[in-house]
Each structure stands twice: as structure tokens, then as C-alpha cells.
Amino acid sequence: MYSTKCIQKQAHKEGIWCCTWGENRNRNKQYIITGSLDNGLIAWEWTNSQLKCLYQFEGHRLGVISVDINSTGTLAASSSLDSQILLWDLETGRLTKTYDGDPADTWTIAFSPDSRFLATGSHTGCVNMINVQTAQKEGSIQLEGKFVYXLAYISDGSKLAAGTINGLVSICDLETGSVQFLDGHATPVRSVSFSPDGRLLASASDDKQIKVFDVRDGRLVIPSLNGHKGWVVSVDFASDNRHLVTASTDCSVRIWDLASKEEKHCFNTHEDQVWCARYSPQGNNIISVGDDRSIMIYQCA
């Protein structure tokens, strides 16, 4: 049931810190974006169980630390240690917009489900909302925690979750402006992910744990999923709402079953720290990237 489907070694010149998997349904194409400390991004097409390099984006002056693809699969966004956010057209490969943030102001990014806004997390604990069409900031939300490591939108776009360096998980109601704080971790929260049905929120932390919250009342549904031996730096929900994939500095990628609250499978194919893992839009494949400069694609269905 679980197997390694594709290995792309030396995909970048340096470690790969971020990846995302999107889909353009109108063109029947699946796109993968990887970002590296070599300052570059690569857009890949996943076709016939193989990775095809489409574009090598150049524009950042320092390492790329966060990437995302909009809901229509037409636009990619990247943020870098150079404090810039760049928007890329996935049909032409051209740079379309540039947003210059403050130093350490663009550590993480996330497209809104309607593709109109790009949320960015900053070192001050502020979440900025960037208009995709104008590349201008249109609003911000101040959180209690400092240094926003992770952002995730709920599927209907009404809420935005954030993870911060002091272990707080926040759920921002974008319609009312209220913020709910979930105190679940004692160390930095590196990644958050909503279930596709919007009922659950998963968080991953340096404390080696994954926690799952009820979005409605903030109740801790699963206090801890244990198994990783290092920081858990990435978490993502499967399309079935019942499974999670996590990546860790212990060099492993793990799949979790939420019903049994147990690890279902562990991939140990990377030779160094793994920084990001994401499900494909259909949920039948997983991508992972890490410091070994490799891209791994796994079959999970």
C-alpha cells in the first residue's frame, strides 16, 4: 500500500526547505514547487508518475523558505530570507508581482482559498494580508506569540491558523477579527494544517509531538501523536480527513491514522533532515523534501 514512487536526487544545489503540490483542473495538470537555500525555486509537473522540470525561477537573493500554489493552479508564490515575496505565472513561468516586506517579515506564506489574498507571517507576531492583484498590504492581525512560523487557511477561507515560536496555536476568525489561542505546545510550532472538512486542526512542534484540535471549541482531540525522535517541522492533512503526514529532523516521513491515533507507516528514504511533506490534491501521493537535496514521491493508496 505504501511505497516510494519517485526519487529525484540533487534536485537543488543546496538543501530544500519547502514544497507544495497544486492542481490546474482546467489544464488537467499537477504542479509541484520546491524552494531551496540555493536561492532558487523549481516548478515541476507531475505526469506519468514522473517529475518533469518546467521552470527554474530566479529572483530571490537569499534562500527560499516558503512556497504555495493558488487554488486554481495558475499562480505560485515564494518567500525568502531576503524579505521578498515573488508571484509567478505557472503557465508562462514569468515573474508577475513583487512584494517587499520588512526584515524577517515574510517567513511563511499561504494563499487564501479564493486566491485573492496572500497571508504572510512575521517575526513580530503579525500576520499581514497581501492583495495578490496589487501586491499591497491591505490589513494585518496581531497575535500574542512572536515569530509566526506557520500559516494555514480553512477550506472556506473564513479562518486562518498560525503557529508561533512560543508554542501557541492561534485561530483567527477573518470575518469577526477575533483570535482564539490554543495552548498546546511548550516549544515552537513549525506547521499547522486544517482538515479539508474544516473540523480539525493539526499542529507540529519542536517538542517532537503532533496535536489535533477541534476547530469549533479549541478542545484538544488528540493530545499527542508520538514517534518522531526530532523536531516535527511539517504536518499536512490527507483529503480523506482521517490521515496526517509529518516530516521531521529525524530524517523520517510518517503517516498517522487519526481513528487509531497510531503511526501507520514510516518512510526512511531521506539521508538528512526532512523539512516539508505534502499530500497531492487527490491524497494518493506524498512529496517530501529535505537537506539531502532530494525530492521523494510516495504512493499511499
UniProtKB/Swiss-Prot annotation:
What InterPro entries does the record tag this protein with? G-protein_beta_WD-40_rep (IPR020472), SKI8 (IPR051510), WD40/YVTN_repeat-like_dom_sf (IPR015943), WD40_repeat_CS (IPR019775), WD40_repeat_dom_sf (IPR036322), WD40_rpt (IPR001680)
Keyword Repeat assigned to the entry: answer is yes
Query: What are the GO cellular component annotations?
Result: Cdc73/Paf1 complex
User: Which superkingdom heads the taxonomic lineage of this protein's source?
Assistant: Eukaryota
* SUPFAM superfamilies found in the cross-reference section: WD40 repeat-like
Please give the name of this protein: WD repeat-containing protein SL1-17
Which keywords fit this entry according to its UniProt record? Repeat, WD repeat
Q: Which organism is it from?
A: Schistosoma mansoni (Blood fluke)
User: What span is annotated as the signal peptide, if there is one?
Assistant: none
Manganese among the record's keywords?
no
Q: What ranges cover the WD repeats?
A: 11-54, 59-98, 101-140, 143-182, 184-223, 227-266, 269-300
